[in-house]
């Protein structure tokens, strides 16, 4: 969690100091749009959004899983996207890093794909930004009830488990708010924990 806070701060500093941005980091109310994130101003594909969903793609895959043995039962149904982002300011965005650990069979493998290589996923691998916005994920794990439970956690341990998906991880098919954020956006690199910073939303 500390890493995410630092990353968000560094991102905001870069916007201000290198790009001339005068405002503050916008706040996104996850529960407000949990029924359909693609209708939020942040993801509606308009010129002021962070672009929209990907084109319909990857028809040979009917669901995505969380790429870890800790969550074999969580199967995320394919949404209405999966292909390249086609609208908004980042429709021509290029993703170059990864994949490292993706469950999508629609992502071209990285030139360094041997899982025993310490540089796995670090080879130059240019491709389009892909998204498969999942209201199935957001409606279950970023809704009002989940966020209130998280904020009302009695201690840091409970907060951590509510954020990350339980103890043990993903017990009872519980994804947690943090993991759900990744898989609400989905696609590539959004659903690859190791390269997800390349998904700017």
Can you describe what each PLM-predicted range is?
Residues 1-201:
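C-terminal accessory segments of proteins
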């Amino acid at each position: 969690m500390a890493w995410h806070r630092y990353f968000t701060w560094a991102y905001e500093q870069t916007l201000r100091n290198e790009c001339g941005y005068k405002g503050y980091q916008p706040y996104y109310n996850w529960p407000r749009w949990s029924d359909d994130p693609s209708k939020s101003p942040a993801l509606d594909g308009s010129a002021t959004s962070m672009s929209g969903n990907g084109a319909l793609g990857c028809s040979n895959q009917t669901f995505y899983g969380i790429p870890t043995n800790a969550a074999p039962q969580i199967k995320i149904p394919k949404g209405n996207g999966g292909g390249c982002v086609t609208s908004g300011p980042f429709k021509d965005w290029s993703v170059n890093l990864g994949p490292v650990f993706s469950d999508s069979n629609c992502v071209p493998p990285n030139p360094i794909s041997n899982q025993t290589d310490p540089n796995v996923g670090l080879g130059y691998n240019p491709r389009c930004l892909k998204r498969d916005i999942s209201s199935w994920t957001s409606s279950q794990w970023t809704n009002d009830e989940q966020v209130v439970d998280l904020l009302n956690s009695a201690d840091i341990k409970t907060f951590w488990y509510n954020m990350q998906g339980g103890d043990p991880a993903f017990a009872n098919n519980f994804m947690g708010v943090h993991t759900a954020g990744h898989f609400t956006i989905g696609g590539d690199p959004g659903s690859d924990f190791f390269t997800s910073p390349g998904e700017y939303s």
